[in-house]
């Protein structure tokens, strides 16, 4: 199998062209490849497939390091756009892709940055999915170590966002897995910990579903800003500082699509025997 190793702000991926290669991945194979000591090592594997819809350019699949398939990854989407361009699979500047849960437009800007139309945030609890009687801007979540207030939203994948006073001392290591596996999120959840610096700037750490805490989570940054805007804490354009670097997130409110802008880096190409 030929592959590329890439990262978006330190959130690292193996990207595979399944258009020119005939490949099948079992969860066990993905877990073996994800092993940082015995395999390649990655947070997620991204698969480039032919489009299911003639009006689109590609189909985009995402697998966690534990072998589970997920519906969305914002940092991965930027790497996906960089990969299909570098490999000559398209010469378009605006690339239309489908995912498990919807469609996305990946735009390569003149300065090389990649701007992703992430679509509209989804707030309806049943569609996140999240167990609640109705939408609220804040929900009370009880865990074995503390009770937290969180916002819940889907960016094509489920997120809960907790505001913290200090990102450095936030209890991500213990609280992250408790939120990820909370019974009110039947498909598990990505847990974001957000410190508001001012209305146009936040700091964020994300404990990702199936991957643990990562250097950066693009959809998590989108979710944090969406929740912050909805709660009246943030303006429509926000710089999000993650451990691996910064993203710009723009959202003008309900009924509008959300945009994420950031970089994507190609590290190396490789071949591995399956």
From Swiss-Prot:
E.C. no = 5.1.1.7
Which residues carry out catalysis? 73 (proton donor), 217 (proton acceptor)
* Annotated positions for site Could be important to modulate the pK values of the two catalytic cysteine residues: 159, 208
Q: Where in the cell is it found?
A: Cytoplasm
Reactions accelerated catalytically:
(2S,6S)-2,6-diaminopimelate = meso-2,6-diaminopimelate
Site Important for dimerization: which residues?
Answer: 268
Give any single GO term for biological process.
Answer: lysine biosynthetic process via diaminopimelate
Lineage top rank: taxon: Bacteria
Which segments cross the bilayer?
A: none
Q: InterPro entries, per this entry?
A: DAP_epimerase_AS (IPR018510), DAP_epimerase_DapF (IPR001653)
Q: In which pathway does it act?
A: Amino-acid biosynthesis; L-lysine biosynthesis via DAP pathway; DL-2,6-diaminopimelate from LL-2,6-diaminopimelate: step 1/1
For this protein, the record's NCBIfam families field holds: DapF
Q: Oligomeric state and partners?
A: Homodimer.
What protein name is recorded for this chain?
Diaminopimelate epimerase
